[in-house]
Amino acid sequence: MTPPNDARITLMNYDDPLEWAQSVTRELENILLQEITQRGRASLLLSGGTTPARVYETLATRPLDWSKIDIGLVDERWLSPQDKDSNAWLVRHTLLEHAKHATFLPLIRPGKTLNQCVHDANLQITHSPPPCAAVLGMGNDGHTASLFPGSLDLPKAISTLQPYVALDATGCPGAGVWPLRITLTPAGLSNIPHRLLLLCGKQKMQVLETALSCKDALDYPIRTAIDLPNARLRVHWCA
């Protein structure tokens, strides 16, 4: 298939999964190095899922000064961070087992309510320098982060000025059996200068093409990342 030529995104396409993972890793490594050089410290937000996991494993082997890097999450399921279905567990076991000196900032705090965790996440991100990069994924339903089409909370999540919100995705197939979420919002993403969308497979490209032609972010929430001003969304797609 022919990838779309759209001025709203910067598209890099690959045929080899290894080349794809190495290219994304190099880009993230360069962003982190530049941020550490300029500010003395860097912060990176990561998504869950099997697609970015390959990149995290590769990034963990890079000779970065991990003691100067904070790792946060784009979104999280309302689960214990120790649960194997949580994004925190995935990041710990793909990246942090090797990059042991990085500081991890999970979204879920044991003993706190969902709303308290959202409050803490907003305090953390608003009282710190903005993350230098965010790694995003996209579901076959067009969701990114935990912004699910069909959620009754989606309109508020898209319009809020808060960086993080709680979202109930009950009834949304893409959310599976974990409807309660904490998610980064478009407002939170807008302050992050480098936004990378990682995609694998022809179906994901078809979804992206449909989203690019769609006019309503409520139908394809990935549009919230595509339509943000300033830096264009950088899409790394492996066929």
UniProtKB/Swiss-Prot annotation:
Enzyme Commission numbers on file: 3.1.1.31
Pathway: Carbohydrate degradation; pentose phosphate pathway; D-ribulose 5-phosphate from D-glucose 6-phosphate (oxidative stage): step 2/3
Gene3D superfamilies per UniProt: 3.40.50.1360
One of the GO BP terms on file: pentose-phosphate shunt
Reactions the enzyme catalyzes: 6-phospho-D-glucono-1,5-lactone + H2O = 6-phospho-D-gluconate + H(+)
UniProt keyword Hydrolase present: yes
Cited Pfam families: Glucosamine_iso
Domain of life of the native organism: Bacteria
Protein family membership: Belongs to the glucosamine/galactosamine-6-phosphate isomerase family. 6-phosphogluconolactonase subfamily.
Functional summary from the UniProt entry: Hydrolysis of 6-phosphogluconolactone to 6-phosphogluconate.
Protein name in the entry: 6-phosphogluconolactonase
Species: Xylella fastidiosa (strain 9a5c)
Gene it is expressed from: pgl
